[in-house]
Structure formats: structure tokens, C-alpha cells
Design a protein with these regions (language model features):
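Short beta-alpha junctions and helix-cap segments that line functional grooves
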Residues: 50, 107, 170-174, 198, ...
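Functional transmembrane alpha-helices
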Residues: 88-97, 210-243, 247-378, 393-416, ...
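Residue-level signature of transmembrane alpha-helical entry/exit and packing/kink sites
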Residues: 2, 6-10, 97-106, 110, ...
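Juxtamembrane extramembrane loops of integral membrane proteins
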Residues: 75-82, 92, 97, 142-201, ...
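Alpha-helical transmembrane segments of multi-pass membrane proteins
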Residues: 14-18, 71, 113, 372-381, ...
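Small-residue-rich helix-interface/hinge motifs
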Residues: 2-85, 379-401
């Protein structure tokens, strides 16, 4: 059921973004009196699920959910309609319009996607505001993934600054270390200040981080599996584990370190229940689990809720949109640095779908839709033939040089671009499949 909800959110989100992206091309084409022959959500290779012709335009839904398109008269695009291009240009065709008009038509989808992202972020701030745990309330420091521990960080460290920039939100630490390729991490450890120097060439390892870090918390039971080993041992909700086989335990990560990879093994656990300390014996199962879920940081630290008026939400939403855009451009840049091996983390529809929550949450849905809208805008403006950016590149050449590239050249460029895009699509989704088997 979780997978179905994720797929549904992905399809709804992409459908919204694709329709509005193509609408950007469509509206500008009609403004400049260019005929649009087709307007499709998803591709209709061979057949369509639905179609209806209104005026000069056929509107439809294809069966292949890899995108969508508008077929603009007199334009060399993925339809590769050579017969139409052999005929004399007509006043209603794309090729008969001025270069600046054609440029605006090609930029229409990208502009709509970017403005849509800003609009969504504004509405998210207005509707839900922000809720977060201030860094000064995270009193026990953080628990780190192994790749960060390998840098010299220790569980319990409080991260104060990255490359001299004070940390404002703990959720951004993981992102900033990786994307900004942080060189110096300032931490507080046992009351002392330390600088952790990040060696060069760590990006490829850090890109493999899943959660990076989370606030460190005591090991308290939040849920017990019915008939699980911990429940059978007599444990209760809200019990705090403070010792394992005589070794004191202050935090959940310490409990995991003492019991991990031990299958079908009994442990003597010291448990704090209210003001009483109890001793219980609990065993791991064949998977090395006790059958309980721990409390998380939100159970220990009070959050701050910030509400925005509509006027206040406008700059907040715009800033969020530009921040996300800048971050994604930095991540995209990593793909062209072989030493980072960022290409190994490239994912397709499975990876995109996995970022949606397993339950339908409108705030997270709209945040993810805005994020994907920015990705769609950036990817489409890349100067690759067959993408909007490829057409923009050739139009800018025409405007600057005064010479229009020949139709044959544009046809060949379109073919090369389509092959490149299909190869990237295949590679990204193959990465997803390989990742599923690895997991």
C-alpha cells in the first residue's frame, strides 16, 4: 500500500508539472499566432488513452508516462515531421515567426515551471508556516553515519559552523557538507571547541550518505511489537534502557553499538521505569532485532512554529525557491566532476518516487512538487538538442550571428539529442533497478 501511495503522488505531481510546462509553450505560441497541432500529457507512441480535437489542436493523454509534449506547426522537434518541413512556410508556423518570438515560445515551459515553484513555496509558507527544532535545543549533539564518523566526528559532537558559517538549521548540515564540499567543521566536544578538517576527495563517499546525522537521544521505547522479544521480556512503553550487560548506555546509538549484528542472542538490560531501575533479559531475533521502536528527537525537543502572513510568505517562498535552485545547480555541477562519482547516484523514476512519503501529506506533497518543478525547469533549459535548452541554444546563435541553422543540421541535432536523452533515461533507471537488488 505504501508503494501505491508513493506512485500515486509521483503521477499526480508529474501530471501537474507536465501539463503546466506544456501550457507555457502553448500559451505563448497562441499569443504569437502559431498553430499548436497536439497537446499531450504523456507520450502517445502508437495510440492514446484519450484524445479530443478542439479547433486546430488535438488534446490527449498518452499511455507512456515519460513526459508530455506540444506539437507546434513548422518546428523540428521529436515528431520529426519531415514532410511538413518540405512545404513552404505558412504564416501560422513556428519557422515563419521572428527569432525573439520563437525564443520566448521555447522558454515558456521553463518560465512556468520556475514561477510555479515559487508560487507553491509561497502558498506552503502561508498555509503551514515552518516547524523546526532550533540547534541550541539539541542538547546531546548528533548521531552520525559511518562516513561522517570516518572524517573524525564522534557521536555526541555538536556542530557549530561549516567553513566559518554558523549552523542555523540542523537539517541542512548533511546537505551543506556534501553540496558545498565543506572543508572545516567546527564542533563542540565535551565542552571543548575543535576544528575537523575534511580531507580532499571525500565527496564520492559522502554522496552515499542516507540520513547523514540526526539529533542524539536516549534509548526510550516508543512502541513494542506484539509478541516481540522485548514485549515478552516485560518491557513497557516509555522504558529507558540505561545499560547492556553491565555497560552503561546513555543514548540509542550506544545501545545499537552494543547489540548490532548479534542474532538470537540474550542481553541483560538495565531499564529505567519512572524512578525505578529494573533488570530484564531480552533476546534478539534471527534478524538481530528486539521488536521495539525507539523514540525520536521530536519526542525530546520542543519545536518552534513560525506562522507567516500572506505578505510575509512571498519573500520567504521566493528565497526558498532560489535557495533550492542554487543547491540543485551545485549538485548538477558535480555530475561533470568524475572524481566525485556523482553519476553513480543518478536515479530515475524509482528514486524520484521514493522521496515522496508513504502516507499522503499535502504539505510534503506540495514541497516535493515545487522541488521537482525546479528540477524540470533546470533540466529542460540544458543546452541539449531535443530539450527546450537545445532549441534556445540554436535560437540564440541565430539572434547573435544573424544566420539560421539549416533544417538538415537541426534534424541531425534532434536525433543526437534524443539518443543522448534516452541513454541517460536508461542509465538512470538501470541505476534504480541495481540499487533495489543491492538493498
Amino acid at each position: 500500500m505504501d508503494v501505491v501511495v508513493k506512485i500515486a503522488q509521483l503521477l499526480v505531481s508529474l501530471s501537474i508539472l507536465i501539463v503546466l510546462h506544456e501550457m507555457g509553450h502553448f500559451v505563448l505560441a497562441r499569443i504569437f499566432k502559431v498553430r499548436v497541432e497536439k497537446f499531450y500529457l504523456f507520450f502517445d507512441a502508437g495510440f492514446s488513452l484519450f484524445k479530443k480535437k478542439i479547433g486546430d489542436t488535438e488534446y490527449g493523454i498518452g499511455w507512456l508516462p515519460l513526459g508530455g509534449y506540444v506539437k507546434i506547426s513548422g518546428m523540428i522537434d521529436e515528431s520529426m515531421d519531415r514532410e511538413q518541413m518540405k512545404k513552404p512556410p505558412q504564416p501560422y508556423e513556428f519557422r515563419s515567426k521572428k527569432a525573439w518570438q520563437r525564443l520566448l515560445i521555447m522558454l515558456g515551459g521553463v518560465i512556468v515551471n520556475f514561477l510555479l515553484a515559487l508560487f507553491i513555496y509561497i502558498l506552503v509558507f502561508f498555509s503551514w508556516g515552518e516547524e523546526y527544532v532550533p540547534v541550541d535545543r539539541i542538547e546531546w549533539g548528533y548521531e552520525f553515519e559511518q562516513e561522517l564518523l570516518d572524517l573524525g566526528l564522534k557521536n555526541g559532537d555538536k556542530i557549530l559552523a561549516l567553513d566559518g558559517n554558523e549552523v542555523e538549521r540542523w537539517v541542512a548540515i548533511h546537505h551543506d557538507i556534501v553540496v558545498n564540499e565543506t572543508q572545516v567543521i567546527k564542533v563542540e566536544r565535551d565542552g571543548s571547541l575543535l576544528d575537523i578538517n575534511v580531507p580532499e576527495g571525500q565527496t564520492s563517499k559522502l554522496l552515499k550518505l542516507k540520513f547523514g546525522l540526526i539529533p542524539r537521544v536516549p534509548c526510550e521505547l516508543d512502541g513494542l511489537l506484539k509478541d516481540g522479544n522485548m514485549a515478552k521480556a516485560g518491557a513497557e512503553i516509555n522504558d529507558r534502557i540505561i545499560g547492556v550487560n553491565g555497560t552503561p548506555v546513555g543514548f540509542y546509538d550506544e545501545f545499537v553499538d552494543l547489540t548490532r549484528k548479534e542474532t538470537n542472542t540474550s542481553f541483560e538490560l538495565s531499564v529505567l521505569r519512572g524512578s525505578d531501575t529494573l533488570q530484564i533479559t531480552a533476546s534478539t531475533d534471527k534478524d538481530g532485532l528486539f521488536g521495539f521502536s525507539p523514540k525520536i528527537y521530536l519526542d525530546f525537543f520542543e519545536t518552534v512554529v513560525v506562522k507567516y502572513s500572506f505578505i510575509q510568505s512571498i519573500p520567504a517562498g521566493i528565497n526558498r525557491g532560489f535557495d533550492i535552485t542554487g543547491s540543485y545547480l551545485k549538485q548538477l555541477k558535480m555530475l561533470f566532476k568524475p572524481e566525485t562519482k556523482a553519476y553513480e547516484e543518478l536515479g530515475g523514476f524509482i528514486k524520484i518516487g521514493s522521496i515522496f512519503p508513504s502516507t499522503w501529506d499535502w504539505e510534503r506533497f506540495w514541497n516535493m512538487t515545487a522541488f521537482l518543478s525546479i528540477i524540470l525547469a533546470i533540466m529542460n533549459v540544458l543546452p541539449i538538442p531535443a530539450l527546450d535548452g537545445g532549441h534556445v541554444m540554436f535560437l540564440l546563435f541565430e539572434i547573435v550571428s544573424g544566420r539560421k541553422p539549416g533544417d538538415k543540421f537541426l534534424e541531425y541535432a534532434q536525433i543526437v539529442g534524443m539518443v543522448l536523452l534516452l541513454s541517460l533515461l536508461l542509465y538512470a533507471n538501470l541505476n534504480d533497478i541495481i540499487g533495489l537488488f543491492k538493498n
